[in-house]
Amino acid sequence: MTDIQNKNYIIALDQGTTSSRAIIFDRDANVVCTAQREFTQHYPQAGWVEHDPMEIFATQSAVMVEALAQAGLHHDQVAAIGITNQRETTVVWDKVTGRPIYNAIVWQCRRSTEICQQLKRDGHEQYINDTTGLVTDPYFSGTKLKWILDNVEGSRERARNGELLFGTIDSWLIWKFTGGKTHVTDYTNASRTMLFNIHTLEWDAKMLEILDVPREMLPEVKSSSEIYGRTKSGIAIGGIAGDQQAALFGQMCVEAGQAKNTYGTGCFLLMNTGDKAVKSNHGMLTTIACGPRGEVAYALEGAVFNGGSTVQWLRDELKIIADATDTEYFAGKVKDSNGVYLVPAFTGLGAPYWDPYARGALFGLTRGVRVDHIIRAALESIAYQTRDVLDAMQQDSGERLKALRVDGGAVANNFLMQFQADILGTQVERPQMRETTALGAAYLAGLACGFWRSLDELRGKAVIEREFEPQLDEGAKEKLYAGWQKAVSRTRDWEPHEGAE
């Protein structure tokens, strides 16, 4: 093997839901170059979402070549590749031709809803939760895979004969990059399939039987940081993690009680629970994360449905702001929300309420309420919902939140970050490096090949750009939060449905 000292770069491949990206990092974990290409979204029916796996591979290969060319680098200068990916998205391909037998079924796709309903009717819901840490929902790969095997003629038989392979996007990319030599996944991606026992760390025989999935088609499961194989040009592939777990690692949340929140359209919260697979009483997912060396650790995961989308609503539907960045200015013009609470339950409420029948509402309106107050209430709602999830995680895990690391587009909003710290009563840490997902994949690959020697070396590179300290006293904080809880309670069970009074 060429001396690692002569190779001064790591490439992170960030395969997302709408685009494929390549980010080149140097030894100081600085971004040298980025390349990105979008690809086609296919919507064959209402609620169905597909991608073409060949287009995903083509765009991901192209951006890697593009990034190297832009940076003026040769592949010999790259120590390793780390891969992070949209999770749960499901691909089945022919082992000989390397061609998919059907489009990739994307994590957002709801076509396997009826399969999930049948699993519930058959009494499997508790077993699924106990074994896989997941809820019975079309979100996860298992029912998507069953749908393909049920609907593509002869596919189940071919899979039993060892002719077909299954993988999440990481597996598919590695298979293609290694020229069909390597069929692997990592523990974080396996834990999102609904086929994997997160306690024994093996594919679960009963789940395979329930969903009628042939064992022969499944990838080998490995840690998130080791050398899995090499590309045709000889670059080692050394790190794999699902996107949210990669962000958790990129934020250096590797010890129990450390948590990160990604503020996007919704919010993704993950809290590391160390070597304990904590069972949630609040509908959180129990999932696998990356330990200090990329080994198995556990995490609780919760999602807020409407984060940045609440601000988009102010802009696109209400038209009271021209740009999302304006919200910080308007929110700062008033000293508080004047008693206004906005509960953005546009599509129901997620964790910890899980009420699909809740609907959005604006409370506390008086003649003294101005547009500024409503804009401020919209930003505050993102912070309140984050506290809802983090409070539940702390109750489930018994871990006290040390500090909240943040990433995603909305973290540039200083008002939101300060209010988040205030309402949590906990320090919020905003990193200088915003590419935390790609950085996590780069770290995992770098540790695997000796590019970086230890976690301590990486910690030294994690620069916090700004710390937001809580400034509200306990009484004021809890009074505000009690108002939020009251507002949420009034939105519950709004939409008429069977079983409602």
Curated annotation (Swiss-Prot):
Glycerol binds at residues 87-88, 139, 243-244. ADP binds at residues 17, 21, 265, 308, 409, 413. Sn-glycerol 3-phosphate binds at residues 17, 87-88, 139, 243. SUPFAM superfamilies: Actin-like ATPase domain (SSF53067). GO terms for molecular function: ATP binding; glycerol kinase activity. It comes from the Bacteria. GO terms for cellular component: cytosol. GO terms for biological process: glycerol catabolic process; glycerol metabolic process; glycerol-3-phosphate metabolic process. The keyword Hydrolase does not apply. It catalyses: glycerol + ATP = sn-glycerol 3-phosphate + ADP + H(+). Its EC number is 2.7.1.30. Keywords: ATP-binding, Glycerol metabolism, Kinase, Nucleotide-binding, Transferase. Pfam families: FGGY_C, FGGY_N. ATP binds at residues 17-19, 265, 308, 312, 409. Pathway: Polyol metabolism; glycerol degradation via glycerol kinase pathway; sn-glycerol 3-phosphate from glycerol: step 1/1. Inhibited by fructose 1,6-bisphosphate (FBP). Belongs to the FGGY kinase family. Key enzyme in the regulation of glycerol uptake and metabolism. Catalyzes the phosphorylation of glycerol to yield sn-glycerol 3-phosphate. This is Glycerol kinase. It comes from Pseudomonas fluorescens (strain SBW25).
